[in-house]
A protein has these predicted regions:
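N-terminal pro-sequences and low-complexity stem/linker regions of secreted or lumenal proteins
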Residues: 2-5, 10-23, 30-496
Length: 496
């Protein structure tokens, strides 16, 4: 698939049309992404706003004694569409988006071209952050194999620690306390990515050490030319360079946090109880429930090949009753809704995450060995970021070409593209601390106290009223969309 096939159309509508009584929303958007940090709660207050960062022990989830917020009074977009990819850090996807020569005048961008970033390899070599090199079909599937993404692996990546040392030989669910976390109040050094990748590689390959090329790929990332769709949208609209995952771990807990402001104390997908722990979780309300209570519309779109919605499964205790309703629909319905102007007030899009991936996830799964032309080839599940690019292209164009007079259209719909977690790929920015959900909070799974956020992930806001070249430096995290919807519609908060 050539870049010409996937780059957003050059005939995109003007980003800053002259105000008219029917379309002027600049007072709300301020020509800056999601209405900037005033709309999506950020900064120190942002960390506090996501107080229930993944936890439930010692905390009353979805408290009903919280009053509804006052709806906003300034006109703005009426529809929000979120597309969430999988397992890529900000630096891995967008770290090279701008250089000193291409940076918009007066802007700041916390990317890789503005510093000297590296990790040490186990043999003492300096491995610098770099742009991927090699054949296109190989580069588009890097890093391969998939990095470690569970909480203990993230600890090694952030702090460079493996504690106890025996954890290096175990899979995450078998590891022991303190699960590679430092035993003091150390701050993240961001120097353990190569170390952890070597550990994970050797475990997956049953003791075989990676070559320098294999081990160094964890410090690699994509150039803008390699990701023409994401890069074009990030430059032509707004990019957030400090948007953090809610939990320093993997998919389920971060996707749970995104819509419920809690991961029920979990930091792994299936450790400590298996996948059933999500089905048996407390019936904690989500933002979907708040929208339903307010008489507003919402819909989760997922691929037909996926068979079930992961969002629906993660929040089964409160969303199962909607599984067989119009609230959960295939992607074909999304394109129909966008075309006919019937997108809901809030839409969440899931890519294919199990079969024939278009979610950007690095190749993962059991390693397979094959002999081809006498050479042993070891690989895992096929995954290619170009498939994710194609999905973003299609989702964006469906909104861009929506021109209905009533309902949703290109002028009143905001598209947010983000990712659930960094997935073990390199990022140079240490995640900030966060406010634990309760003064007497007890440790959750693997002893985590939910006092720090996950790593940076890509986040791009696309709106007809967003000025090209907008870079939002304010601190955001996965609780920000809930905050936006709550303030936009006067919903009852999910937590304090």
């Amino acid at each position: 698939m050539s870049s010409d096939d996937t780059t957003p159309d050059e005939t995109a509508p003007e980003h800053s049309p002259e105000p008219t009584p029917a379309t002027s929303r600049r007072g709300f958007l301020k020509a800056s992404g999601l209405g900037l940090a005033g709309l999506v709660v950020g900064g120190a207050a942002g960390a506090a706003a996501g107080a229930a960062i993944g936890h439930s022990i010692g905390y009353s989830e979805g408290q009903d004694d919280l009053g509804a917020l006052t709806p906003r009074q300034v006109a703005g977009f009426e529809h929000i569409v979120v597309l969430m990819g999988e397992n890529r850090s900000f630096d891995n996807m967008l770290g090279w988006l701008y250089t000193a020569e291409t940076l918009p005048q007066g802007a700041k961008f916390d990317g890789l071209a503005f510093g000297d970033y590296s990790n040490k390899s186990p043999d003492g070599r300096t491995v610098k952050a770099h742009v991927y090199e090699g054949p296109t079909d190989v580069v588009m599937g890097k890093p391969n194999p998939d990095p470690g993404e569970e909480y203990p692996h993230v600890n090694t990546q952030l702090f460079g620690t493996v504690d106890p040392a025996s954890n290096a030989e175990l899979f995450a669910e078998q590891m022991h306390y303190p699960y590679n976390a430092p035993r003091d109040a150390s701050k993240p050094t961001m120097d353990g990515f190569v170390k952890d990748y070597h550990i994970n590689f050797e475990r997956l390959h049953k003791g075989k050490e990676p070559t320098n090329e294999e081990g160094d790929q964890i410090m690699g990332g994509f150039s803008p030319e390699m990701l023409p769709v994401l890069s074009t949208l990030a430059r032509e609209f707004a990019v957030f360079d400090h948007w953090y995952a809610g939990v320093p771990s993997q998919t389920y807990c971060n996707r749970s946090f995104f819509h419920a402001s809690t991961s029920h104390g979990h930091v792994t997908n299936k450790g400590a109880g298996g996948y059933s722990k999500w089905l048996d979780a407390q019936p904690t309300p989500t933002v979907f429930n708040r929208l339903e209570e307010a008489g507003l519309t919402w819909r989760v779109y997922f691929d037909e090949l996926q068979l079930i919605s992961l969002t629906g499964m993660i929040h089964a205790p409160v969303l199962e009753k909607y599984w067989a309703t119009e609230r959960f629909a295939y992607m074909s319905q999304y394109y129909k809704d966008a075309r006919e102007g019937t997108l809901p007030d809030y839409a969440f899009i899931e890519p294919r995450m199990v079969y024939n991936h278009n979610d950007f996830h690095p190749p993962f799964g059991a390693l397979r060995e094959s002999v081809i032309d006498g050479e042993v080839v070891v690989d895992s599940a096929v995954s290619d970021v170009r498939a994710g690019e194609a999905l973003v292209h299609d989702v964006y164009n469906a909104i861009k070409h929506s021109a209905t007079d009533k309902g949703s259209n290109a002028l009143n719909t905001l598209l947010l593209i983000t990712f659930d977690e960094h997935g073990g790929t390199y990022d140079h920015v240490a995640p900030p601390s966060a406010t634990p959900p309760h003064p007497n909070t007890q440790p959750g799974e693997m002893g985590f106290t939910f006092d720090r956020l996950g790593l940076r992930v890509p986040a791009i806001a696309v709106s007809a009223y967003t000025r090209a070249g907008t870079i939002i430096n304010d601190e955001m995290h996965h609780g920000s969309v809930i905050s936006t919807l709550s303030r936009q519609h006067g919903l009852k908060p999910l937590n304090q």
